């Protein structure tokens, strides 16, 4: 005779052996090496512990997929691959009392976090570029609703402050989330006589390098380009871009 598993008693939860990895909705159409490597690290550790990985897309306004997974008890835990101000997903996870960890930095120290020091990295890169002779460094980063981008701006400003050089705020461009916005920010930076473009990540740097080639602007002879995240995407096109290196796979394993 076949014995059916007993139903959970009271508030007891049924173990699913599934972990959800939440990815920002806007990343669906992007090929981001950071996320791929991070996912690889998560998969390795999940497999070692007998868990499977489920993907879940969410944004600050759309999180129905996560809500459905939680309501139907599909996952035992969740990994958020980004840190965002006032993230509704965090409140939802707390309502369902689901364990979760954040890849990124949050001011809420009750949230388990795995992160790289973005402020220190951006500060150090800015100082190095200033030491190399750059004077007008334009910064191109994504939306400041994400902590990683506010941290990169803070590090950039700190780098100038530590070097004793004033910052031209016209060279700071945030909200760069698409190829079109990248080209607009680059155009504005060139109009402001930037001698270096510091990109928030490899995707922005890739777009910048492509446009500079189109304009026959030589890197680094005519203009320096640097990125606050390195990847195979950049290595495949040029060796002339200075970039910060992080071990995204290890970050995923830690989470």
Language model features by range: what are they?
Residues 1-17:
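N-terminal helix-turn-helix DNA-binding module of bacterial transcription factors
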Residues 57, 104, 141, 171-174, ...:
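Residue-level recognition of beta-strand->loop/alpha-helix junctions
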Residues 114-139, 154, 158-162, 178-187, ...:
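Hydrophobic alpha-helical segments within soluble ligand-binding/sensing domains
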């Amino acid at each position: 005779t076949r014995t059916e598993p007993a139903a959970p008693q009271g508030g007891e939860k049924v173990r699913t052996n599934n972990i959800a990895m939440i990815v920002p909705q806007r990343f669906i159409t992007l090929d981001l090496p950071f996320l791929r490597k991070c996912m690889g690290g998560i998969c390795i550790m999940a497999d070692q512990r007998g868990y499977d990985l489920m993907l879940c897309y969410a944004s600050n306004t759309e999180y129905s997929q996560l809500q459905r997974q939680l309501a139907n008890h599909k996952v035992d835990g969740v990994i958020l691959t980004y840190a965002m101000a006032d993230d509704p997903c965090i409140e939802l996870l707390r309502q369902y009392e689901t364990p979760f960890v954040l890849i990124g930095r949050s001011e809420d120290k009750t949230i388990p976090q795995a992160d790289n020091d973005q402020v220190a990295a951006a500060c150090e890169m800015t100082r190095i570029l200033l030491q190399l002779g750059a004077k007008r460094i334009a910064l191109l980063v994504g939306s400041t609703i994400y902590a990683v981008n506010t941290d990169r701006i803070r590090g950039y400003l700190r780098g100038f402050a530590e070097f004793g050089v004033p910052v031209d705020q016209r060279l700071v461009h945030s909200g760069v989330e698409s190829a079109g916005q990248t080209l607009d920010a680059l155009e504005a930076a060139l109009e402001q006589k930037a001698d270096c473009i510091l990109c928030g990540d490899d995707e922005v740097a890739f777009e910048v390098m492509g446009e500079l080639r189109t304009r026959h602007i030589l890197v680094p002879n005519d203009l320096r380009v640097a990125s606050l995240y390195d990847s195979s995407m950049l290595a495949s096109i040029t060796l002339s871009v200075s970039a910060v290196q992080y071990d995204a796979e290890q970050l995923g394993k830690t989470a």
